[in-house]
Amino acid sequence: MVMNVRVLTPTRVICSTTADEVILPGLTGLVGILDGHAALITALDTGLLRIKLNEKWTPIILCGGLAEIDRNRVTVLVNDVEELVAVELNEATTELEKATLAVENAETSKARLDASIELKKAVARLEGMNYLS
């Protein structure tokens, strides 16, 4: 049996589909969701959402939010999403290195927080490249 999955931002529906499996970027690590999962509401971190249907994975970069799992329905409410585009591995690696340096060189708490969010996005982009081929 498949699950119904919806990914929503405050301004639009990103996707509404079915899935065999969903992997969410939780605050304390990845959360795997299969058919019949116990009811759950969980906070989401910036990272890569993975939706699997018929042995094909669809990646979506999330920018924080929450997810509600209820029977065979997964609703993901996020602040924003980032389009995952095919880029060269060198470019993605360079972005990751720049983001890492920005975190290390941040002089204020706000700058460090902003840089850490960009670092999480860079990691998600690099991870997401595995699903684009």
Swiss-Prot record:
Pfam family, any one: ATP-synt_DE_N
Bilayer topology term: Peripheral membrane protein
Entry keyword annotation includes Thylakoid: yes
Domain of life, source organism: Eukaryota
Cross-referenced Gene3D superfamilies: F0F1 ATP synthase delta/epsilon subunit, N-terminal
Principal localisation: plastid
Subunit and partners: F-type ATPases have 2 components, CF(1) - the catalytic core - and CF(0) - the membrane proton channel. CF(1) has five subunits: alpha(3), beta(3), gamma(1), delta(1), epsilon(1). CF(0) has three main subunits: a, b and c.
Protein function: Produces ATP from ADP in the presence of a proton gradient across the membrane.
Protein name: ATP synthase epsilon chain, chloroplastic
Organism: Trieres chinensis (Marine centric diatom)
Lineage: Eukaryota, Sar, Stramenopiles, Ochrophyta, Bacillariophyta
Gene name in the database record: atpE
